[in-house]
């Protein structure tokens, strides 16, 4: 296999309502990838996040993010009009997501959908609840309680709730019954739309790469129901938990990326059943889970990031001439700057090294020269954020800002992905044998 991919969070897609969704704009992005002869779309985690809105902070590893639900189908069903939606406050900045405003407006709209449709006789909703009973009930209860406690961390809920007192939970189930059903219904809507999007991607020859964090956050359903969910002490228990997570990921993605970060070191591991068995992958994850920061690089020896090949902490394995045919290589990770922004931050000596490596010192050529250098490597898959194809600067990075509130807020401007850009990417893919369905 020799192919290429684009990193683009769904939440960053263009939208008239403050945040990208699973609807028409996601399908349009798939159309763009297909026309560019790109066959992997890395979407970032799609989980229901905590109040930080970071995609790495999942309330539940299996629950989809309600903010990504497309509202157009409910306009078509007459629940509300486009004009009613446009009157809501989704935030005025077309270049950044205002999560507080988007969340308030989106949940107001989704409550209208629930009031109109959530209690109608619907065998498909009943079937969804039955098929997902192993996680859905706990998740919906947890989400309702999290809202009840005004999004405070789990340890501040009180011992009775935090330790799952039967009496306390029974009382809350009665008190929050309607809200619990609301959160169940949102998952039904989310996964209905997700299934449609995945089928569309498959039709276009685009494989979806999803990702999940190695450690689950403290305020999550998994740690609430199983405090040992992050434990790596016992091999068999660890493997059982991860096999369940991988089985779920196979229902959602074609390729799954597992991410772990310790101090300044980070590692990715990739799961696709034709590449590696679940047993072998769980063994790799166990090594990653037990590794110290200094050992992570060895555990993730097949993953590379161009930007990490330069500077004071440079590692030669990140340079494209070292990539082998099993490698999965990135321009940079989601916490790194864009190419243009990164080069501007380099000291003179390091910048000269980069320019000599990519063969140009001209700012207008640097981003595409880095991409070209990556694309001609031996790596099996090379991936770049869409921002680098667009040659955008630091303000368009996904995360790593000094102010954490600016993380995960970047939005793609509608009309940025032109036919000319698609043709340029397609030419590069064909030139370096990364085109065609894999």
Each model region followed by its residue ranges:
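Acidic/aromatic-lined carbohydrate-recognition and catalytic surfaces
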Residues: 1-226
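Conserved alpha/beta catalytic core and glycan-binding cleft of carbohydrate-active enzymes
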Residues: 124, 263-394
């Amino acid at each position: 296999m020799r192919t290429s991919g684009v990193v683009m969070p769904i939440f960053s897609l263009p939208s008239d309502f403050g945040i990208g969704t699973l609807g028409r704009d996601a399908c349009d992005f798939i159309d763009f990838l297909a026309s560019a002869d790109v066959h992997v779309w890395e979407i970032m985690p799609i989980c229901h996040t905590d109040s930080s809105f970071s995609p790495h902070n999942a309330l539940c590893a299996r629950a989809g993010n309600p903010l990504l639900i497309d509202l157009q189908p409910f306009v078509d069903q007459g629940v509300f009009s486009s004009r009613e939606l446009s009157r809501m406050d989704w935030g005025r900045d077309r270049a950044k997501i205002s999560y507080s405003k988007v969340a308030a407006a989106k949940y107001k709209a989704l409550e209208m959908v629930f009031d109109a449709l959530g209690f109608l006789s619907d065998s498909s909703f009943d079937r969804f609840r039955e098929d997902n009973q192993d996680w859905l009930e706990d998740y919906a209860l947890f989400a309702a309680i999290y809202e009840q406690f005004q999004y405070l961390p789990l340890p501040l809920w009180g011992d009775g709730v935090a330790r799952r007192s039967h009496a306390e939970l029974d009382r809350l189930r009665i008190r929050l019954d309607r809200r619990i059903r609301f959160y169940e219904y949102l998952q039904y809507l989310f996964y209905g739309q997700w299934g449609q999007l995945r089928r569309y991607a498959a039709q276009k020859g685009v494989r979806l790469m999803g990702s999940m964090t190695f450690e689950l956050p403290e305020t999550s359903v998994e740690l609430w129901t199983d405090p040992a969910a992050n434990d790596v002490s016992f091999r068999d228990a660890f493997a059982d938990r991860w096999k369940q997570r991988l089985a779920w990921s196979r229902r959602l993605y074609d390729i799954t990326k597992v991410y772990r970060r310790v101090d300044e070191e980070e590692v990715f591991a990739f799961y696709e059943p034709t590449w590696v068995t679940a047993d072998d992958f769980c063994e790799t994850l166990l090594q990653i889970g037990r590794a110290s920061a200094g050992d992570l690089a060895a555990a993730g020896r097949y993953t590379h990031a161009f930007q990490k090949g330069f500077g004071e902490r440079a590692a030669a394995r990140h340079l494209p001439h070292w990539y082998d045919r099993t490698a999965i290589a990135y321009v940079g990770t989601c916490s790194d700057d864009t190419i243009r922004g990164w080069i501007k931050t380099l000291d003179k000596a390091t910048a000269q090294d980069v320019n000599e490596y990519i063969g140009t010192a001209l700012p207008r050529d640097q981003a595409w020269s880095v991409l070209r250098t990556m694309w001609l490597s031996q790596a099996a898959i090379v991936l770049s954020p869409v921002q680098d194809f667009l040659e955008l600067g630091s303000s368009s990075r996904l995360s790593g800002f000094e102010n954490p509130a600016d993380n995960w807020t970047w939005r793609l401007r509608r009309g940025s992905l032109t036919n000319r850009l698609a043709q340029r990417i397609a030419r590069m893919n064909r030139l370096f044998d990364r085109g065609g369905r894999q």
